[in-house]
Amino acid sequence: MPKFQGAIFDVDGVLVDSPHQKAWRESLRELMEAGWRDIRDQTTWSPDAFTPHVYQQYVSGKPRMAGALAALDYFHVPDTEKRVAEYAQRKQEMVVRLIEAGDFTAYPDALRFVIATKDAGMRIADASSSKNAGLFLRKIRLDTFAAEHGISSPTLKPGQTLLDYFDVDVSGRDFARGKPDPEIFLTAAHELGVEPGHAMVIEDASSGVQAAKAGGMAALGISRADDADLLAEAGADLVVTSLDDVNRDALTRGELTR
């Protein structure tokens, strides 16, 4: 297997525990309990039905409009075409409020892994379909994290945010096709100057794993929602529950293993 030269990271669920799931769930609840209450009985929605499993399998990793449509279709909401934009906008307004309020955390194992991949000589990119990804990445001071955790890195500069640290940022761009199409990851690899076969993608969603494999890349699945089986079924080369479990010495040989 060729040595990895590039690492491409999804953001929500990989790097940060974001409020996206909360925003999708709660914005739909608000609609169902107010403006859409007249059609509620025609749907399969209930306050407890929008589970983490539903989010991971049907919504996670998709662009905003596609995610909104997937959720409405899942709950059999009628007249989706005229409702999807309202739902997507309501979700966006809520997620921005939550981000500005600091209602998210960065995963320490992910930040350690990001630093380790760059220290190993790889070029790195963030590649999320979310247009909010940059809001998270700008708020995370990677130099502060490293200092607090005793990490010394030759690639880390004072004052660097996580967004600054990435060599390439393709998050939030408008692509013609969303995941599981590989367009976003192929674009990231191209801008990194790395052939797809020399790149690995770190993903928490089945659609993202499928996109990586469709693009000819290695896929590292991170299971944070008890969905390891879904990631494996999607074709992940390795699935872990913590990125600390990945064998970093093996990475330098182009191997994904524990």
Give the ranges of each region predicted by the language model.
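Short, acidic loop-to-helix structural element flanking the phosphoryl-transfer center
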Residues: 2-3, 8, 97-126, 134
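Hydrophobic residues in well-ordered beta-strands that form the structural core
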Residues: 15-17, 126, 221
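An amphipathic alpha-helix signature
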Residues: 21, 25, 29, 33, ...
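Short, surface-exposed acidic
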Residues: 32-56, 77-87, 91, 158, ...
